[in-house]
């Protein structure tokens, strides 16, 4: 990417990391996934992936690096990538607000939650079997739903304004 685009990506990563940090006291209620989705929608799949992976990596300097970090990077990056592939060309703020919020909930529960629940089994068990995966998915479901609800709320609050600003930046700096 061009230097102009890298600056915008760095700003979005910073927003995502700060947003996770600000809500540290509320378990699983984080706006970071919403920022990643908005990045993918506003700047395309490549930037969505980069913002997702870099945000997970950088925020873990505050919350702690561990064997889960690459899994978080992969999960967040995947959400940003898919968001860009699905919405970046056909996004209309007036018509797409609710579908993007529903999509954000599904991303938190199915994609991010599914990858992280799978990661917990693979990281912490020597005897991998379907029972462990089932237990991980069932026990992780309430956590994923809370994360999904927070993603809906933050997408509802932020998507229109942030995407409008990203579109303005894209035009102004020919990104």
What are these regions (language model features)?
Residues 17-31, 53-87:
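Interfacial aromatic-anchored transmembrane helix boundaries in multi-pass membrane proteins
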Residues 1-38:
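Hydrophobic transmembrane alpha-helices
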Residues 6-11, 34-35, 46-53, 70-74, ...:
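Hydrophobic alpha-helical transmembrane segments
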Residues 32-48, 82-86:
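Generic transmembrane alpha-helix motif of multi-pass integral membrane proteins
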Residues 69-70, 91-175:
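Membrane-embedded alpha-helical hairpins and interfacial helices in multi-pass inner-membrane proteins
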